[in-house]
Amino acid sequence: MKPISFIIPSRNNLKYLKWCYNSIRKNLGYIHEICIADDASEDGTWEWLQDISKKDLGVKIHRNKGPERQGLVVLYDKLVKDYSTNDVIMIFHADMYACPGLDKALFKHLKKGTIVCATRVEPSLHPPGPEKIVADYGIEPEEFDEQKFLTDLNNFRDKEKITNGIFAPWAI
């Protein structure tokens, strides 16, 4: 399998970012690169990123010192252009959980010139859409019912459905 560069900007979202990082490493292993940008956070994100990048050589970090935010789009571009080294790019949010087999499922559908979106599973906080499954496994990382989610994962209807919806997470 080819390695993926996960592109993750974050601002003052440390507990979610840790949860996201841990899900990638736990469920997908260390083959994939994780490129993370801190957008002038004040919650300890930069200090945690410095620590984790010393322990995990597959993590590349960038910091916007601020005081002004740069925003997601600028930081996505920065991470893709200056930090990612793989042919496949996965646009991810700091509050997303990487399911077991996400990488294999992406490569099953990814062809040259296409964009593949993973299905989002989230509680009914936002309007429904074709690209997501509405289900509640907890909103905060400490509330996340991982065991129930993983048990239900294989039973989701339409998990192989192809839609025209596009929203992160997506890979190119």
Language model features with spans:
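Conserved donor-nucleotide/metal-binding helix-loop-beta segment in metal-dependent transferases, i.e.
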Residues: 101-118
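A conserved acidic beta->alpha catalytic loop
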Residues: 38-47
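Short beta-strand-to-loop element that shapes/binds the nucleotide-sugar donor at the catalytic cleft/hinge
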Residues: 116-134
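Glycine-rich, basic loop-to-helix element that forms the pyrophosphate-binding segment
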Residues: 65-83
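Short, acidic, metal-binding catalytic loop of nucleotide-sugar glycosyltransferases
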Residues: 22-31
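The conserved acidic donor/metal-binding loop of glycosyltransferases
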Residues: 93-97
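Short aromatic/hydrophobic "clamp" motif used to bind/position activated sugar donors
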Residues: 89
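A recurrent flexible, glycine/aromatic-enriched loop bordering the glycosyltransferase active site
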Residues: 151-172
